[in-house]
UniProtKB/Swiss-Prot annotation:
One of its GO terms (biological process) is thiamine diphosphate biosynthetic process. This is Hydroxyethylthiazole kinase. Its EC number is 2.7.1.50. It is an enzyme of class 2 (transferase). Catalyzes the phosphorylation of the hydroxyl group of 4-methyl-5-beta-hydroxyethylthiazole (THZ). Its cofactor is Mg(2+). Belongs to the Thz kinase family. It comes from Syntrophus aciditrophicus (strain SB). It comes from the Bacteria. It catalyses: 5-(2-hydroxyethyl)-4-methylthiazole + ATP = 4-methyl-5-(2-phosphooxyethyl)-thiazole + ADP + H(+). It holds the Pfam family HK. InterPro entries: Hyethyz_kinase, Ribokinase-like.
Amino acid sequence: MQITPENTWAAVKAIRSRAPLIHNITNYVVMNSTANALLALGASPVMAHAQEEVEEMVGIAQALVVNIGTLSPSWVRAMASAALKAADRGIPIILDPVGAGATAYRTRTAFQLLETVSPTIIRGNASEILAFESVETMETRGVDSTELSQNAVDAGRRLNDSYGSTVCISGETDFIIGDRAILGIRNGHPLMTRVTGLGCTASALCGAFAAVNSSFTLAAAQAMAVMGIAGEMAAEISPGPGSLQLHFLDILYRLTEEDIARRLRIVAGE
């Protein structure tokens, strides 16, 4: 199994033609930007977090994205209910453990969601992935990663072995672990780190690609590749982070097969 420009473009076309409904229980900071990115890609976003309706909403969605960026007890209950319903329906579940390791509550919540239902894809930075291994000691790592992505590969392997989840570790090189393979993608630009919420956007795009793909490892790799390609193209014409946000959406909307073929950078695979 390998990511190629051809299968990545085929997935983009599938998203654009099918417009899969992606149910996001995400944080206040990124709701708008995440929804706009999904729309630009061609998917259909919905942001619903009330426990009274999440199961019903999952019932019509093609993927569920759970993001713990802004937590409250009612949201945690809604996340668990939605995840159980998604598992019952057999649709992809993407978990973004934002800031896991920063506080005990955040780390426990991420671990409880992992235990409640094994997510299809877990996407986080290296510190967040490593936090799953320190859940007993509650080592504080912070919201932004203090680790290189390659430092979490072994932890990602263990998560994959234990829960069957594809693990996507974002960083300068994105590592995707699953299907008895490790894929490495090296697209993107340093300016992307100056825009809040692009990691959360990547998780949402994982949901869109998982909705049209039978291989969730490939779906995560394709999502990270498209995210990185659009980001680096946007950075090339942006003097700062404000304009990058605007150009990112436009380029995601206009992305072509030629863009992917010219820019996709695969640096590891086995």
